[in-house]
């Protein structure tokens, strides 16, 4: 202790001042000031009480568009779009942005809000991408907060809710992508999926070969592919066979699935 004190006393004043300022910055980064803590709590409360996607965007000063598209089987899905960087002049709704297009899709039991409900815009991928010059779209599965309508069924009927992840892959993903490309006039887009949003894309790209021409990059964040506890020994054995040919039957309300001439080998 005495040695440290002597060394500190003997150090030149500029050196001690420099060390003092550095330690203050380190301390401030680890222990926020009361003003910053109050500001952070205020932002957290605003996020917690936000009613919808629009409220979450307005917290950070971003403009957005809301679109509704119709799937081939009659469901109305909500799409959200961010095409104007923060502080830039807003373009007319639905107008071509002439920018590279990115499509983000949420995970299980979520909606598009999951991408923008963070405590800093620097941590929200859609905000980062739109500021970098991308035309950002966020999708929603049928049945969630933004997709509870259909031209065929009443949302309160059993028929409306009679769907599964197969319908997400067969209709929701490809139809959403087609709507976006038709509106933006873009040739293709980049797909970012989170959890089940990745699984839906894997399935959609498999059963719709033409969809692969519309997706230039597929990014799977925390992809959900094989949930634990749902193992089926017979199916597992078939999938691990050396050569397996699959012919999936036609759905009554859709065009036939593609019959794949071969499936890559799966190793145990």
What is each residue range found by the language model?
Residues 1-32, 181-187, 196-268:
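Alpha/beta-hydrolase-fold enzymes
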Residues 14-70, 80-86:
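An N-terminal hydrophobic leader/cap segment in hydrolases
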Residues 43-44, 51-56, 71, 78-154:
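Short, surface-exposed "cap/lid" segments of acyl-processing enzymes
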Residues 77-78, 167-171, 179, 188, ...:
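Catalytic domains of lipid- and phosphate-ester/thioester hydrolases
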Residues 106, 126-131, 169, 177-181, ...:
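Amphipathic alpha-helical interaction motifs in eukaryotic regulatory proteins
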Residues 106-108, 189-198:
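Conserved alpha/beta-hydrolase "nucleophile elbow" surrounding the catalytic nucleophile
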Residues 154-157, 236-237:
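Short, hinge-like loop/turn segments at secondary-structure boundaries
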Residues 158-183:
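Alpha/beta-hydrolase active-site loop
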């Amino acid at each position: 202790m005495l040695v440290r004190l002597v060394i500190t006393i003997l150090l030149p004043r500029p050196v001690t001042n420099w060390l003092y300022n550095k330690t203050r910055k380190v301390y401030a980064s680890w222990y926020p000031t009361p003003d910053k803590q109050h500001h952070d709590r205020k932002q957290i409360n605003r996020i917690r009480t936000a009613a919808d996607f629009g409220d979450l965007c307005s917290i950070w000063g971003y403009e957005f568009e809301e679109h509704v598209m119709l799937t081939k089987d009659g469901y109305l899905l909500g799409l959200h779009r961010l095409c104007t960087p923060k502080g830039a002049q807003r373009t007319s709704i639905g107008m071509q942005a002439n920018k590279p297009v990115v499509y983000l899709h949420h995970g299980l039991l979520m909606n598009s809000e999951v991408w923008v409900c963070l405590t800093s815009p620097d941590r929200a991928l859609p905000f980062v991408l739109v500021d970098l010059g991308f035309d950002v779209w966020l999708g929603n599965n049928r049945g969630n907060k933004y997709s509870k309508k259909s031209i065929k069924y009443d949302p309160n009927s059993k028929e409306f809710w009679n769907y599964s992840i197969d319908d997400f892959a067969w209709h929701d993903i490809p139809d959403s992508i087609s709507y976006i490309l038709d509106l933006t006039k873009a040739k293709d887009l980049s797909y970012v999926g989170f959890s089940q949003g990745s699984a839906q894309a894997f399935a959609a790209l498999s059963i719709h070969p033409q969809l692969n021409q519309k997706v230039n990059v597929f990014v799977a964040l925390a992809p959900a592919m094989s949930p634990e506890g749902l193992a089926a020994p017979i199916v597992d054995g078939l999938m691990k066979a050396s050569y397996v040919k699959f012919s999936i039957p036609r759905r009554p309300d859709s065009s036939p699935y593609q019959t794949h001439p071969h499936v890559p080998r799966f190793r145990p």
